[in-house]
C-alpha cells in the first residue's frame, strides 16, 4: 500500500501522521504542492527492504544536465519572485507561456519535465527520466520545510475560523468536524454554497480534477476506466487550493469576504 500524502502533509488521523498507514508514502514537491521545489519529490518508508530497493533505483537514475538545473533554478526564482510580489504579473506570465506553447514557440528543454505526459512510452533525448533530485532543489526543500513548520498553526486557525463562519455541517465534509482528524488544511473541499462564496471574489485555481492529470491525452489511453477511482472522481470536482503562503492581512481579507457573503444568505 502506497499513500500519496503531498496534500495531507503533516495531518493526522487517530493520532497517526499520514504516511504511516501503508508500506510507503510518496510526497511530490512540484509547484502545486505545499513543499515547493518546482519539480521532484521524496519517498518515506519504515520498511528496510523497500528503502534499500528505492535507494538502488535512485542510484541508477541519471542526473539532469547543468544547463537544465540552471533553468530549473531560474524558473523557481522567477515564479517565487513574481507570484509573491505581483499576482497580476504572474497571471500575465502564464498567459504568455500558454500562447507560446500554442504557437509552438518554446525551448526544447522544459524545467517541468513535461515530455513524460504521454501514454506512449518513449525515451526523450533531452534529459534523464526519472532523474536524481538536484542538490540545489534538495537545499530549497529543506528551507521550504522550515517555512512550512512555522506556518502550521496559522493554517489550522484559519480553517477553524472558516468553519465557524460556515457553521452548518452540510457545507463541509464531516471530516472537518471529526475530533479524530488533525487536519493541516492545504486544499479545502467545498459545497456549492461555499464555492459560490469563495469564487465570487478570487480566482478559482483548481488542480487535479480527474484521477490522471498533467496530460492533454484522454486518461483512458493510460488504461484508466471511469468508475475505477470513485472517490478521486468525486472530490476532484470539489477541491480548492488554499494559498501556501499567506500573511495575516490577506487572511483577514479572505475571512471578511466569506463573512460578508454568508451574511447576505447567498
PLM regions with names:
Residues 99-107, 125, 218-233, 246-248, ...:
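Non-catalytic terminal extensions of PLP-dependent enzymes
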Residues 4, 29, 41, 155, ...:
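Generic structural signal for small/hydrophobic residues in well-ordered secondary structure
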Residues 10-13, 24-185:
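Active-site region of PLP-dependent enzymes
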Residues 52, 193-200, 248-254:
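Short, conserved charged micro-motifs
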Residues 3, 8-10:
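Catalytic P-loop NTPase motifs of RecA-like helicase/translocase cores
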Residues 64-71, 161, 174-179, 195-240, ...:
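Conserved PLP cofactor-binding pocket of PLP-dependent enzymes
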Residues 45, 190-194, 244-246:
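Short beta-strand-to-loop capping motifs
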Residues 239-249:
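Proline-centric
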Amino acid at each position: 500500500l502506497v499513500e500519496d500524502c503531498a496534500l495531507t502533509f503533516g495531518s493526522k488521523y487517530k493520532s497517526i501522521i499520514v504516511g504511516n498507514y501503508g508500506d510507503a508514502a510518496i510526497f511530490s514537491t512540484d509547484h502545486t504542492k505545499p513543499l515547493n521545489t518546482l519539480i521532484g519529490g521524496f519517498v518515506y518508508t519504515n520498511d528496510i527492504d523497500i528503502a534499500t530497493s528505492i535507494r538502488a533505483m535512485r542510484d541508477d537514475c541519471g542526473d539532469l544536465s547543468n544547463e537544465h538545473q540552471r533553468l530549473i533554478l531560474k524558473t523557481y526564482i522567477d515564479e517565487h519572485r513574481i507570484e509573491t510580489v505581483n499576482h497580476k504579473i504572474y497571471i500575465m506570465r502564464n498567459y504568455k507561456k500558454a500562447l507560446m506553447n500554442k504557437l509552438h514557440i518554446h525551448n526544447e528543454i522544459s524545467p517541468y519535465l513535461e515530455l513524460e505526459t504521454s501514454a506512449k512510452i518513449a525515451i526523450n533525448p533531452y534529459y534523464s527520466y526519472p532523474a536524481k533530485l538536484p542538490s540545489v532543489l534538495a537545499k530549497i526543500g529543506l528551507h521550504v520545510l522550515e517555512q512550512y513548520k512555522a506556518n502550521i498553526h496559522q493554517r489550522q486557525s484559519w480553517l477553524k475560523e472558516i468553519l465557524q463562519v460556515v457553521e452548518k455541517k452540510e457545507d463541509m465534509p464531516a471530516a472537518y468536524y471529526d475530533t479524530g482528524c488533525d487536519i493541516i488544511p492545504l486544499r479545502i473541499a467545498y459545497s456549492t454554497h461555499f464555492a459560490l462564496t469563495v469564487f465570487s471574489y478570487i480566482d478559482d485555481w483548481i488542480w487535479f480534477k480527474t484521477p490522471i492529470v498533467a496530460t492533454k491525452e484522454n486518461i483512458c489511453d493510460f488504461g484508466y476506466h471511469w468508475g475505477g477511482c470513485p472517490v478521486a472522481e468525486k472530490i476532484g470536482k470539489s477541491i480548492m487550493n488554499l494559498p501556501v503562503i499567506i500573511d495575516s492581512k490577506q487572511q483577514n481579507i479572505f475571512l471578511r469576504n466569506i463573512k460578508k457573503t454568508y451574511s447576505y444568505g447567498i
